[in-house]
Amino acid sequence: MSEAEARPTNFIRQIIDEDLASGKHTTVHTRFPPEPNGYLHIGHAKSICLNFGIAQDYKGQCNLRFDDTNPVKEDIEYVESIKNDVEWLGFHWSGNVRYSSDYFDQLHAYAIELINKGLAYVDELTPEQIREYRGTLTQPGKNSPYRDRSVEENLALFEKMRAGGFEEGKACLRAKIDMASPFIVMRDPVLYRIKFAEHHQTGNKWCIYPMYDFTHCISDALEGITHSLCTLEFQDNRRLYDWVLDNITIPVHPRQYEFSRLNLEYTVMSKRKLNLLVTDKHVEGWDDPRMPTISGLRRRGYTAASIREFCKRIGVTKQDNTIEMASLESCIREDLNENAPRAMAVIDPVKLVIENYQGEGEMVTMPNHPNKPEMGSRQVPFSGEIWIDRADFREEANKQYKRLVLGKEVRLRNAYVIKAERVEKDAEGNITTIFCTYDADTLSKDPADGRKVKGVIHWVSAAHALPVEIRLYDRLFSVPNPGAADDFLSVINPESLVIKQGFAEPSLKDAVAGKAFQFEREGYFCLDSRHSTAEKPVFNRTVGLRDTWAKVGE
């Protein structure tokens, strides 16, 4: 298969192919323009993969440009976080990082050009009055009483705005288009507003700041963007995008194309709702492993490759739809099943004593991956006292139960066959110790007499066990569409985080944050980057071995 045939196909790539074939463009230049007022989430990952992926596949360029036109909400912390997320996902921007604020002088000059052409005016209506005058979807707007000021008066007033002569909210610059337009975005939109706030890039040079719709199209043109890709909520804004570029003196006129945004089950994407989860302490921060943020997914153990694969699978369309969480989980599960080394950890431990085991212990050899001998093997200590999971033992059980039962045998993973003989309980009737015997001639082999032992359970040597905290993360919400609830906070899943104290094999003391493991028979886990210490490692469950929510939805 050729490189071109291996590329994903979608309507945007078809447009690009046609543009290149017709000679409209000789190269492809895209951009990813986040506002630095929060952390990126999985929805942004779709846009990142689309814009950078197209540039990569067509051997073009993709700019990283921060839409930093609102100094009140923006911060350098978000700038650095976004840069880190883009790089972590495996992409590299063309040239230096760009900022819309790089173009503030040019934007100001273009605003003056519109005033000189009679296409922009300074309005002194209050923000509330502007909303009132704008009209509705069924009623046209009405003209501002300040709409017909002369060019000279507008130039003087705009300079007064620039010089700090108006208070915030007392004046703005508006485009002069059509207050009766069926598209509300074209009813004399605001181009500049006043904000007395220090900007993280330009300091206190400016007290007037351009609006997104004015900034976006001009920044695209100044950078030579060929295909400006936005989500569908900006579809009507394309009219304003084109109007601005049609009415200023600029040699390049990019085209905007819209695609559907990513909606994912069992989570919310709204910045306001995500912020509420953080500020009300429903989660511990923007990088909480239950959050849909890229930093949260990374801390949970998601790989960049799995997120890229997810974005590839869901594709790019103009049709709004909601993607099943199982699709995202399937991508990370497939990735880690293929690439994660295996290890043993007991999440809900109960002591097991092998009464006829002689000696202090021994080392058993275990493969790091059952299907990849090239990943090597490791030595795991075994002894006469081990920890097993409480769910792996029953005093009585039916034939479907393939684990340890009183009076019956089971195999310890890569070790011996054992038989449960008796148990010891506390005053409440809880089992505290299981006493067993073992067949010394069954180390990693079948019993000599040919008897069949069907069940296999994992274990950790008690004398060598590494105490660990295990955080069992699950979906943050208990319903597929929490945003549709009257109060989305009321449908938070109370079991989205369950903390257990368990034991792991000693090799895991060398685990590093971001490195994934399959805890055999339990799921995929990674060392937590925030809470782990050398004395007490903390492991986060990335995803289970199978989709446990499938039955819930049936």
Curated annotation (Swiss-Prot):
Any Pfam family the entry gives: tRNA-synt_1c_C2
InterPro entries: aa-tRNA-synth_I_CS, Gln-tRNA-synth, Gln/Glu-tRNA_Ligase, Gln_tRNA_ligase_bac, Glu/Gln-tRNA-synth, Glu/Gln-tRNA-synth_Ib_cat-dom, Glu/Gln-tRNA-synth_Ib_codon-bd, Glu_tRNA_lig_a-bdl
Effect noted on mutating Q256I: Loss of catalytic activity
Region: Interaction with tRNA, residue numbers: 317-324
First-level EC class: ligase
An example Gene Ontology molecular-function term: glutamine-tRNA ligase activity
Chain ranges for the short sequence motif 'KMSKS' region as given in the UniProt record: 268-272
Main location: cytoplasm
Assigned keywords, A-Z: Aminoacyl-tRNA synthetase, ATP-binding, Cytoplasm, Ligase, Nucleotide-binding, Protein biosynthesis
GO annotation (BP), single: glutaminyl-tRNA aminoacylation
EC nos: 6.1.1.18
The keyword Aminoacyl-tRNA synthetase is assigned to this record: yes
Classification via SUPFAM superfamilies: Nucleotidylyl transferase, Ribosomal protein L25-like
Positions with a binding annotation for L-glutamine: D67, Y212
Binding site for ATP: 35-37, 41-47, 231, 261-262, 269-271
Catalytic reaction(s) noted: tRNA(Gln) + L-glutamine + ATP = L-glutaminyl-tRNA(Gln) + AMP + diphosphate
GO cellular component, one term: cytosol
Recorded family membership: Belongs to the class-I aminoacyl-tRNA synthetase family.
Protein name as catalogued: Glutamine--tRNA ligase
Organism: Escherichia coli (strain K12)
Organism placement in taxonomy: Bacteria, Pseudomonadati, Pseudomonadota, Gammaproteobacteria, Enterobacterales
The encoding gene: glnS
